[in-house]
């Protein structure tokens, strides 16, 4: 069997509703990692939050964080996770986005670098935050209601054509927000950087997801698998749908059958 790159979204996919990677999943991924398959986490989270949520992600060789803006490799050394790819936003871009802040419409603008997240709510000078950051990877803009999110999606896309601006939605509710990244940044881009490093063809990439920011990787990777609990529009774009949810080890149950069949 050819070596596979297995790309895993976290929230709603690998993590259960308690935000935990099950012991069954950890044990299974350790087993297939030893067989030579490349386990890669692909998430919208920053590195720090990814490691907290997965208790160190020992089962993974790579982490694609910030919706594809950065890639880290498990070096099995004291420094552990080494950055091998980054596509960052300029501070000028962040200032321009922040200039639209309106307390009557916005809740917060979350500004992320590789390892931290800072919240801007209009009460301080944006430069006080930017001075603390070196490599800005990702903005998350949260609104008081979904109508404002739709309003600013159209506005920002017209004003900032050089940015990747997407409407996101909670898989377990209807809350919407905007993710803003450098043009061309998406989970699939980060995954392809891992594939290049490992010499793996696209047909040997298996991606799992449940949310709107997983659609492109499910469409573009060789095999796209939507979770049973995924949003309907995500399922429509997938090659397969797991028979079990994220609370029932859906990823593992799928791989146990799929990797045997091929």
Name each model-derived stretch.
Residues 36-40, 59-61, 138, 203-204, ...:
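Short active-site oxyanion
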Residues 1-3, 22, 181-262:
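Mg2+-dependent phosphoryl-transfer enzymes with acidic/Ser/Thr/Gly-rich catalytic loops
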Residues 21-121:
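Active-site phosphate-binding/coordination module
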Residues 100-208, 212-217:
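Conserved acidic, metal-coordinating active-site core of Asp-based
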Residues 56-59, 66-67, 159-161, 220-221, ...:
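Short, structured coil segments at secondary-structure junctions
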Residues 14, 80-81, 173-177:
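A short acidic, helix-capping loop that chelates divalent metal ions and anchors anionic groups
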Residues 2-19, 218:
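Asp-based phosphoryl-transfer active-site loop
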Residues 57-60, 80-86, 125-131, 182-184, ...:
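Short, hinge-like loop/turn segments at secondary-structure boundaries
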């Amino acid at each position: 069997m050819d070596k596979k790159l297995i790309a895993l979204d976290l929230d709603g996919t690998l993590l259960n509703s308690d935000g935990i990677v099950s012991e069954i999943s950890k044990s299974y991924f350790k087993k297939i990692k030893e067989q030579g398959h490349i386990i890669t986490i692909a998430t919208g989270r920053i590195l720090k939050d990814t490691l907290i949520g997965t208790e160190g992600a020992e089962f993974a060789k790579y982490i694609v964080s910030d919706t594809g803006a950065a890639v880290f490799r498990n070096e099995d050394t004291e420094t552990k996770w080494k950055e091998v790819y980054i596509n960052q936003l300029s501070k000028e871009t962040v200032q321009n986005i922040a200039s639209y802040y309106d307390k009557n419409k916005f809740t917060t603008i979350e500004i992320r670098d590789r390892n931290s997240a800072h919240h801007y709510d209009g009460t301080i000078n944006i430069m006080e935050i930017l001075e603390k950051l070196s490599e800005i990877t990702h903005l998350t803009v949260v609104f008081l209601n979904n109508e404002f999110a739709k309003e600013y999606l159209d506005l920002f896309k017209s004003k900032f054509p050089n940015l990747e601006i997407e409407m996101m939605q909670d898989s377990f509710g209807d809350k919407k927000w905007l993710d803003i990244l450098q043009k061309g940044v998406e989970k699939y881009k980060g995954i392809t950087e891992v594939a290049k490093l490992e010499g793996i063809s696209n047909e040997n990439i298996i991606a799992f997801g449940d949310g709107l920011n997983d659609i492109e990787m499910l469409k573009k990777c060789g095999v796209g698998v939507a979770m049973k609990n995924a949003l309907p529009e995500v399922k429509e774009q997938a090659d397969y749908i797991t028979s079990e949810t994220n609370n029932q080890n859906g990823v593992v149950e799928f791989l146990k059958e799929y990797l045997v069949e091929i």
